[in-house]
Amino acid sequence: MGKNVVVLGTQWGDEGKGKVVDLLTERAKYVVRYQGGHNAGHTLVINGEKTVLHLIPSGILRENVVSIIANGVVLAPDALLREMTELEARGVPVRERLLLSEACPLILPYHVALDNAREKARGAKAIGTTGRGIGPAYEDKVARRGLRVGDLFDKASFAVKLKEIMEYHNFQLVNYYHVDAVDYQSVLDEVMAVADLLTSMVVDVADLLNKAYRNGEYVMFEGAQGTLLDIDHGTYPYVTSSNTTAGGVATGSGIGPRCVDYVLGIVKAYSTRVGAGPFPTELFDSVGEFLCEKGNEFGATTGRRRRTGWLDAVAVRRAVELNSLSGFCLTKLDVLDGLDEVKICVGYRLPDGREVDVTPLAAEGWEGIEPIYEVLPGWKESTFGVKLRDGLPQAALNYIKRIEEVTGVPVDIISTGPDREETIVLRHPFDA
């Protein structure tokens, strides 16, 4: 048998998954995106050169690695084409390395229009979506009216289906949201221009992955967003529209649950969040500003400033449970360099004075809770670029050890910088 390794975020996204996937794919045959869409922003730095991927898996820069966009991903044709063009201009043979599932739902311009119209209508209660049509595309999928990549094999039938669904959505746009309708012909022309390209990359992804596993191949499954944004288990309604937890791997790609061998949870050494929603450890002081500036905490997809705060071990423990995590990769440890002290949230104090060590299930339950902190000594030495565990300051090692103790999960990888080489691998997921 082969080995299937899942890499996913344990917080609210932006944990550094792209770099880690790129690093680990040195030993993988396939890298698979199984949920989300081009609302992801995975940043890779290789030999100082920065690449930001939104839809294409992070393994695309590796020779002899096949990248797959599986059925759980909502696919925007224009975004895919744009990303492919940018990579090909840099000499990356994307068409030789990328495969698609025919079951991928398509994100089309009317989804984007709906997304933005809804956010505007929510006013102060806006979710803070990326405005890229992700949610409306998933809605169409669940309502069984969505168009999929496989529909492009019959272009005449696709045109008819598109007209029907656009009449439905344009009625909403014009009569409920009071915005302009989306032009049918322009959408049809846009999709037809890339239809042959998309269908040329289609394979039976589930069959391919199951055969690869039986044949001893190593496969990496790349999560997007983070556990606390999961549609079912996140801080609802301030969540994304897909299952970001490990359970989404099986439904989003077509492998069975028992075929997952190792789940690597990416945990940032502090916490960040983009957009609205609960964030108990959020900092509004100079330390929060320090983390934002030093950590360059601006969204790779939207450019929005990320909210920053101390590490929330209560929330991370929820991620441990939801994903059956095998190990952690701790990222951005170097951002904490220079602080006099570092804090870990180990519990919450409710408005009525009770103390709990588990996260609420919905956004309303987070209102008024206060973090309970453990305070540890900081370190002045630089951890940036350190490649051996023994090269880390003792205070940093103590911080890592305490994270392991309060979560019950070992830190198997430590990231000390953005480049793939700036990493300490204590236990490789494919060897675990």
From Swiss-Prot:
Give the EC number.
6.3.4.4
Tell me which UniProt keywords the record has, alphabetically. Cytoplasm, GTP-binding, Ligase, Magnesium, Metal-binding, Nucleotide-binding, Purine biosynthesis
Write out the catalysed reaction.
IMP + L-aspartate + GTP = N(6)-(1,2-dicarboxyethyl)-AMP + GDP + phosphate + 2 H(+)
Q: Which GO terms describe its molecular function?
A: adenylosuccinate synthase activity; GTP binding; magnesium ion binding
Which residues are annotated as active site?
D14, H42
Q: Which SMART domains match?
A: Adenylsucc_synt
An example of a Pfam family matching this protein is Adenylsucc_synt
Q: Which residues take part in binding substrate?
A: A300, T301, T302, G303, R304, R305, R306
**Pathway assigned in UniProt:** Purine metabolism; AMP biosynthesis via de novo pathway; AMP from IMP: step 1/2
Could you give the cofactor binding note from the entry?
Binds 1 Mg(2+) ion per subunit.
- List positions binding IMP: D14, E15, G16, K17, N39, A40, G41, H42, T130, R144, Q225, T240, R304
From the UniProt record, give one GO term of the biological process aspect: 'de novo' AMP biosynthetic process
Cofactor(s) this protein requires: Mg(2+)
Q: Where does GTP bind?
A: 13-19, 41-43, 306, 332-334, 415-417
Where is the protein found, in the record's own terms? Answer: Cytoplasm
Question: According to the UniProt record, what class of enzyme is this?
Answer: ligase
Which residues bind Mg(2+) per the record? D14, G41
Give GO cellular component annotations, separated by semicolons.
cytoplasm
The coiled-coil regions, if any, are none
The entry sums up its family as follows: Belongs to the adenylosuccinate synthetase family.
Against HAMAP family, the record matches this protein to:
Adenylosucc_synth
Q: How does it assemble?
A: Homodimer.
* Stated name of the protein: Adenylosuccinate synthetase
Whichever gene encodes this chain, its name is purA
